[in-house]
Curated annotation (Swiss-Prot):
Keywords: Nucleus, Phosphoprotein, Ribosome biogenesis. GO terms for biological process: maturation of 5.8S rRNA; maturation of LSU-rRNA. The modification Phosphoserine is found at S199, S231. Involved in biogenesis of the 60S ribosomal subunit. Residues 195-215 are annotated as: Disordered. Pfam families: Mak16, Ribosomal_L28e. Residues 195-210 have a biased composition (Acidic residues). This is Protein MAK16 homolog. Its main location: nucleus. Signal peptide: none annotated. A motif (Nuclear localization signal) lies at residues 245-251.
Length: 259
């Protein structure tokens, strides 16, 4: 009995920290296991001649263990870097496992294809756009909803007050009757009304009225204008007389004395 058989007998019938037993079978958690199953051919501890595939930082390596390096645990595994080209990598596997068992060669190739496939998927997912999920605090969300509803109610009330003020201003309602309202809304409505009135006055000043009359009407208008001018002059003279009354002259009487 060689050493591999002794190791397997101990692992199989005693205890192994890598074995996982289920209802359907037994599995191995050792990273060097080429198949992931717990059996005589797949066990990396009970086989002095063994090979597997591993991935490190996106690069695929072939790890080979041979009986000559078993006494040296630090040099037990030989690491061989495989090329990115699939055909060249398969050629490397055949060269290093030239006289090995066909079963281990086929399992190494299958593991190589699986590793190469999931590396492709990783690169594709890294380049694709992914959704980022963020947790939501329900308490904060409810508080924000309440604030939004309150802000909408306040805005609706301000709009109603502004409309009421505009209606009262149009109806010439006294501002003294308005109590307990927002003063800014009242001032805003009042400014809007003043701007509208100023624009209307400017528009009326710019307009020119044209009136068509007959010849007799023109003469009558001229006579009326002359009469108005004369009456204005008389009123001005009368005002001057009233405002500046002439002072009475003083009269002194001298009597002659008889000698």
């Amino acid at each position: 009995m060689n050493n591999d058989d002794v190791i397997w007998h101990t692992i199989n019938h005693s205890f192994c920290s890598f074995v996982v037993k289920t209802k359907t079978g037994r599995f191995c958690r050792n990273d060097d296991n080429v198949t992931g199953l717990c059996n005589r051919h797949s066990c990396p501890l009970a086989n002095s001649q063994y090979a597997t595939i591993k991935e490190r930082d996106g690069i695929i390596y072939l790890f080979v263990k041979e009986p000559e390096r078993i006494p040296y645990p630090g040099k037990q595994w030989e690491r061989i870097k495989l090329r990115r080209n699939k055909d060249q990598a398969l050629k490397q596997i055949k060269e290093h496992l030239l006289y090995w068992d066909k079963w281990i060669i086929s399992r190494v190739k299958q593991r190589f294809f699986r590793t190469r496939e999931y590396l492709k998927n990783m690169r594709r997912l890294a380049l694709s756009r992914q959704k980022k999920l963020e947790p939501i605090n329900r308490t904060v969300e409810k508080r924000e909803l309440r604030r939004e509803a309150k802000a909408l109610r306040v805005a609706r009330i301000e709009r109603t007050v502004e409309q009421e003020l505009l209606e009262r201003l149009r109806a010439s309602t006294s501002s003294k009757e308005i109590y307990n309202i927002d003063q800014s809304a009242f001032e805003k409505a009042l400014e809007a009304e003043e701007i509208n009135e100023e624009s209307d006055e400017e528009y009326e000043e710019d307009e020119e009225e044209i009136v068509y009359t007959s010849g007799s009407d023109v003469e009558d208008i001229e006579d009326i204008g002359v009469i108005d001018e004369e009456s204005e002059e008389e009123e001005a003279e009368h005002n001057l007389v009233l405002t500046n009354p002439k002072k009475k002259r003083k009269v002194t009487i001298h009597y002659e004395k008889d000698e």
